[in-house]
Each structure stands twice: as C-alpha cells, then as structure tokens.
Amino acid sequence: LRPAVIVRTKAL
C-alpha cells in the first residue's frame, strides 16, 4: 500500500 493510504487508514 502507498504511504498516503496507510496514513489515511490510521486517521480513521
């Protein structure tokens, strides 16, 4: 997964 996607997932 892309770094940006991981950050958004943790933001949830």
UniProtKB/Swiss-Prot annotation:
Expressed by the skin glands. Signal peptide: none annotated. The keyword rRNA-binding does not apply. The keyword Chaperone does not apply. It is found in: Secreted. GO terms for biological process: defense response to bacterium. This is Antimicrobial peptide 1.
